[in-house]
């Protein structure tokens, strides 16, 4: 519709979650018409992030160092491990300020139909952490979806086999909801009222 380069920019912006064709077009035109300096800055920062941000070696969240700020913090409770689906879930729980343990990011959830099995969500790495014997409680904070519940059950069985106490965050979170969209108060209540499973 526009020039090939503008069309390419619009299509690239459509890859962002929640951005449809109209929003992508508005963003592209705004950056090109009214905020070229902002567009240049966005381009530079995005290129740096793509080059330097990678997965934490211990919890698999996003970081610029080998270990993220949480995993490298010796003051956190090493006996508690909260298991989440995405780095956005770590941010959501950290914002609630009610959890002081460590995290493990699955980077998804079990979904055999989509070809996502235990290996794809890092169960081999997680099983190794369980076997180390340092973790006393696992708090499962997967989303309350069918796949999230199946993933929680699978992880629960593996942790219990190692003698680890397992709890699931309480359901103050709406069924079918995503953790990154839940307000801090609701999330704080859900974590503080977690239940053993």
Curated annotation (Swiss-Prot):
Residues 79-174 form the Toprim domain. Pfam families: RecR_C, RecR_HhH, RecR_ZnF, Toprim_4. A zinc finger (C4-type) spans 56-71. InterPro entries: DNA_Rcmb_RecR, Rcmb_RecR, Rcmb_RecR_Znf, TOPRIM_dom, TOPRIM_RecR. GO terms for biological process: DNA recombination; DNA repair. Keywords: DNA damage, DNA recombination, DNA repair, Metal-binding, Zinc, Zinc-finger. GO terms for molecular function: DNA binding; zinc ion binding. CDD domains: TOPRIM_recR. The keyword DNA damage applies. Disulfide bonds: none annotated. PROSITE patterns: RECR, TOPRIM. The keyword Cytoplasm does not apply. HAMAP family: RecR. May play a role in DNA repair. It seems to be involved in an RecBC-independent recombinational process of DNA repair. It may act with RecF and RecO. This is Recombination protein RecR. It comes from Saccharophagus degradans (strain 2-40 / ATCC 43961 / DSM 17024).
């Amino acid at each position: 519709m526009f020039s090939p380069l503008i069309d390419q920019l619009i299509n690239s912006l459509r890859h962002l979650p929640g951005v449809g064709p109209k929003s992508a077009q508005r963003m592209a035109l705004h950056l090109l018409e009214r905020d070229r300096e902002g567009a240049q800055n966005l381009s530079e920062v995005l290129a740096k992030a793509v080059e330097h941000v990678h997965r934490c070696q211990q919890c698999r969240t996003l970081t610029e160092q080998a270990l993220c700020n949480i995993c490298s913090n010796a003051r956190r409770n090493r006996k508690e491990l909260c298991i989440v689906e995405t780095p956005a879930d770590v941010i959501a729980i950290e914002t609630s300020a009610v959890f002081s343990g460590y995290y493990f990011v699955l980077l998804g959830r079990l979904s055999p139909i989509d070809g996502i099995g235990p290996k794809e969500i890092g169960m081999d790495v997680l099983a190794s952490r369980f076997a180390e014997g340092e973790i006393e409680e696992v708090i499962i904070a997967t989303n309350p979806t069918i796949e999230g519940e199946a993933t929680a059950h699978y992880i629960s069985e593996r942790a219990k086999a190692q003698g680890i106490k397992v709890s699931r965050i309480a359901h103050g979170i709406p069924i079918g909801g995503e953790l990154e969209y839940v307000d801090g108060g609701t999330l704080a209540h859900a974590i503080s009222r977690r239940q053993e499973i």
